[in-house]
């Protein structure tokens, strides 16, 4: 049973220093590395409060992310510090909604530079099926947390007429403990496929270009699987679809200039 009914709604903050290998050609934090920090924060906080993957492992279960919406007003540079605050907003319909606020941390202040919302489910690692979190007593009676005001993701249609197309075979370094391609690896694979000028523009101009990421995880792929990455660019956004060899969408994403 949870320590108290408010344990999932509790806010906790973790600080990160932006390392040299985490920035791009404009010295701005890469988007997929920011996603890694968000997911690592979620994992550490959930473990510390007793409902993370460590608590689920005896049941052969683990948390998996199904969707994320992220808005950034500023992308930090190497050596700068960010603080990521996170909490669970709601558990409903076998899904858990987790929110984040991202702050640029200095000696003078913590300035809000971004916000994100993610949706999670619990995966039975052996059966490869989503399970009802409320079957686990640790989630009984948990109270909802603060609602984060961020626009819902638009419906993303598959890319059918790509500007760029590539293939990728899932490698050892792509696969995580859940035995599938890691969620952050999808974004890296997609961003490596696109036209680099768009991403360079997003991180140029002193990082002042506000951007939004919408990403949906739809179907697992595993070690040795080959996927096709389709990329379509307009003036203000770039959209991706990752397809399996059978033509099913494995992941869809959109990066938009705000």
Regions found by a protein language model. Give the residues of each.
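HotDog/MaoC-like acyl-thioester-processing domains
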Residues: 3, 9-14, 69-157, 221-226, ...
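Structured core of small recognition/catalytic domains
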Residues: 180-258
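Small beta-barrel nucleic-acid-binding modules, principally OB-folds
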Residues: 60-75, 208-220
């Amino acid at each position: 049973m949870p320590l108290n009914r408010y344990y999932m709604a509790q806010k906790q903050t973790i600080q990160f220093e932006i390392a040299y290998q985490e920035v791009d050609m404009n010295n701005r934090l890469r988007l997929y590395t920011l996603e890694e920090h968000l997911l690592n924060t979620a994992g550490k906080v959930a473990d510390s409060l007793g409902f993370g993957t460590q608590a689920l492992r005896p049941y052969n279960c683990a948390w998996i992310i199904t969707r994320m919406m992220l808005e950034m007003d500023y992308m930090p540079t190497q050596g700068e510090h960010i603080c990521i605050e996170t909490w669970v907003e709601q558990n409903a319909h076998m899904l858990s909604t987790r929110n984040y606020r991202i702050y640029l941390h200095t000696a003078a202040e913590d300035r809000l530079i971004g916000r994100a919302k993610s949706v999670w489910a619990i995966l039975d690692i052996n059966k490869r099926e989503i399970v009802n979190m409320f079957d686990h007593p640790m989630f009984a009676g948990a109270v909802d947390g603060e609602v984060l005001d961020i626009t819902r993701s638009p419906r993303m249609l598959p890319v059918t007429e790509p500007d760029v197309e590539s293939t990728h075979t899932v490698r050892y370094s792509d696969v995580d403990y859940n035995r599938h391609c890691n969620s952050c690896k999808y974004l890296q694979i997609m961003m490596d496929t696109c036209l680099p000028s768009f991403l360079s523009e997003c991180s140029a101009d002193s990082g002042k270009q506000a951007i939004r990421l919408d990403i949906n995880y739809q179907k697992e792929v595993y070690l040795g699987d080959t996927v096709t990455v389709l990329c379509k660019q307009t003036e203000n956004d770039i959209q991706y679809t990752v397809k399996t060899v059978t033509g099913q969408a494995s992941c869809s994403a959109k990066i938009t200039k705000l």
